[in-house]
Amino acid sequence: MDAFSSFFDSQPGSRSWSYDSLKNFRQISPAVQNHLKRVYLTLCCALVASAFGAYLHVLWNIGGILTTIGCIGTMIWLLSCPPYEHQKRLSLLFVSAVLEGASVGPLIKVAIDVDPSILITAFVGTAIAFVCFSAAAMLARRREYLYLGGLLSSGLSMLMWLQFASSIFGGSASIFKFELYFGLLIFVGYMVVDTQEIIEKAHLGDMDYVKHSLTLFTDFVAVFVRILIIMLKNSADKEEKKKKRRN
């Protein structure tokens, strides 16, 4: 009910971006601000670890099903550890980030072979989107976007069902394109919702910055992968059009 009431309370008049909206930062207490600093610092370290994992794949071709299974297993292990095992959980986060990077490595290698600038553009684009949507979540009224969580969960379930159906029955290019853009929309939405949820949990005393960093890390990677695939597909389409013109 809180989610729906905050939604109706935030209708026209409360969503205007003005100087007053910047005052919403005052709703974030100093303790929560320090928590967010730790979350984003840990997230940056996890992204560096992930880049190292991708580099290892480029060198030794280690990415694949095993690294994906290892990444999922490490994340589950991390989430099952009690919060007081701080160092262990932090180590597990970085290990899972390295394995995630190795798992995404094959896609990154394709991008490097096609055009390295695509990889850089995709990462910068993801970083800009992440900063903008995270800032939007911080500037918004508390719990303003949390009502979207249910809609995003339903959308994610639909996306997983589509991918499962496509893997069994086969899928067309149009379905694949829909999955890409729909998935991008879903995970960009999660950037906003997860950021507000982290802030709200911190206000309630949940200062588990390792778990919160993991949440944002998975959002970042999901958006990055989809942007990279979209850019690679667009590049391939352009090359195909050029070949047709030459012929």
From Swiss-Prot:
List-wise, which residues carry N-acetylmethionine? 1
Name the domain of life: Eukaryota
Quote the PROSITE patterns the UniProt record gives: BI1
Query: Where does this one sit in the cell?
Result: Endoplasmic reticulum membrane
The record ties this protein, via Pfam families, to: Bax1-I (PF01027)
Q: Membrane-spanning regions, if any?
A: 58-78, 92-112, 118-138, 145-165, 173-193, 212-232
Please provide the Gene Ontology terms (biological process) for this protein: ER overload response; negative regulation of apoptotic process; negative regulation of programmed cell death; response to water deprivation; very long-chain fatty acid biosynthetic process; very long-chain fatty acid metabolic process
List UniProt keywords, sorted A-Z: Acetylation, Apoptosis, Endoplasmic reticulum, Membrane, Transmembrane, Transmembrane helix
Cross-referenced InterPro entries, in alphabetical order? Answer: Bax_inhbtr1_CS, Bax_inhibitor_1-related
Record's GO cellular component terms: cytoplasm; endoplasmic reticulum; endoplasmic reticulum membrane; nuclear envelope
For the null mutant, the annotation states: No visible phenotype under normal growth conditions. Accelerated methyl jasmonate-induced leaf senescence. Enhanced sensitivity to water stress, heat shock, toxin, tunicamycin and pathogens.
Q: Does the keyword Membrane apply?
A: yes
Query: What is this protein's expression induced by?
Result: Up-regulated by water stress, heat-shock, mycotoxin and pathogens.
Q: In which tissues is it expressed?
A: Expressed in root tips, root vasculature, flower tissues, including stamens and sepals, and in the base of siliques. Not detected in mature leaves.
State if Acetylation is listed as a keyword.
yes
Topology in membrane: Multi-pass membrane protein
The UniProt family comment states:
Belongs to the BI1 family.
Assembly behavior: Interacts (via C-terminus) with calmodulin, CYTB5-B and CYTB5-D. Interacts indirectly with FAH1 via CYTB5-D.
Protein role: Suppressor of apoptosis. Modulator of endoplasmic reticulum stress-mediated programmed cell death. Involved in methyl jasmonate-induced leaf senescence through regulating cytoplasmic calcium level.
Q: What is this protein called?
A: Bax inhibitor 1
Gene transcribed to yield this protein: BI-1
